[in-house]
Regions:
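A domain-start/cap signature at the N-terminus of enzymes
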Residues: 1-53, 128-132, 189-193, 198-203, ...
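Short alpha-helix in the alpha/beta-hydrolase fold that links the catalytic acid
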Residues: 70, 182-193
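Primarily recognizes the serine-hydrolase "nucleophile elbow" in alpha/beta-hydrolase
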Residues: 115-117, 123-167
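Short beta-strand/loop motif that positions the catalytic acidic residue
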Residues: 171-174
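Acidic catalytic loop of the alpha/beta-hydrolase fold
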Residues: 177-182, 212
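Short glycine-rich catalytic loops that host catalytic nucleophiles or stabilize transition states
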Residues: 203-210
């Protein structure tokens, strides 16, 4: 049953009342895997009595959890965000290499541990990513729109949801001079109209630049996440 759920890209973990004590503020390893594990950042303002927004951040091809978090760590304390990052089993995410499965399983375990240890605002659970991670965030986020209320995709290349659940709000950004995932080549200028035509509330931000996440764009995305109704 669990294998079928993973192959369908489905996540089972949900926010709940914590039953364990989480780590104090700062950056911590998840301790779920001996290699290619993951990280969680707990903001200084975190309180058990005040559930915090959660952002699951996914790295690009060849990346890791530390690299994924570098776009957002400086904003976590400002916005009071719990930041979670896991690492793909291969050099990039499973559906890009082959099909859904091993990475969904790892993400579900990381989320289950996070929900068990920390008070998470169920109304602000975001999946985010950069490059291949952005493509995976769109794919997994739409498939699990009954869990993720927000999807943030920095420079995505495609989306491959298995199904559509819920009504997550979506933020997409892309550089007009991106040499890695050109904005016109099956990327954001095609993805955004498809999402809007399907009925998703989508905010789109183009910027002059390449395959990066400018500081003002990441800040705009976090403001959007924490202020959208």
């Amino acid at each position: 049953m669990r294998n079928l759920q993973c192959q369908a890209g489905q996540l089972l973990s949900r926010p709940s009342v914590p039953t364990e004590t989480g780590a104090s503020s700062g950056l911590h390893s998840l301790g779920l895997e001996p290699e290619r594990d993951g990280l969680i950042y707990v903001p200084e303002s975190y309180q058990l009595a005040k559930p915090a927004p959660l952002v699951l951040m996914l790295h690009g091809a060849g990346g890791d959890a530390e690299g994924a978090l570098r776009w957002l760590t400086g904003l976590a304390d400002t916005y009071g965000l719990l930041l979670l990052a896991v690492e793909s089993r291969d050099r990039t995410w499973d559906v890009i290499v082959s099909r859904y499965g091993p990475d969904i399983a790892v993400i579900d375990r990381a989320l289950e541990q996070t929900f068990r240890r920390y008070a998470v605002d169920a109304g602000r659970v975001a999946i985010a990513g950069f490059s291949d991670g952005a493509s995976y965030a769109l794919s997994v986020g739409i498939t699990n729109g009954d869990l993720f209320t927000h999807i943030i995709a920095f420079s995505p290349g495609f989306m491959a949801p298995v199904t559509q659940r819920g009504e997550p709000q979506i933020f997409i950004s892309h550089g007009t001079s991106d040499p890695v995932l050109p904005i016109n080549h099956r990327c954001s200028r095609r993805i955004v109209p498809q999402l809007q035509q399907t009925g998703y509330d989508t905010r789109y931000r183009e910027f002059e630049g390449g395959h990066i996440v400018p500081a003002d764009v990441s800040r705009e995305a976090m403001t959007w996440l924490t202020t959208q109704a």
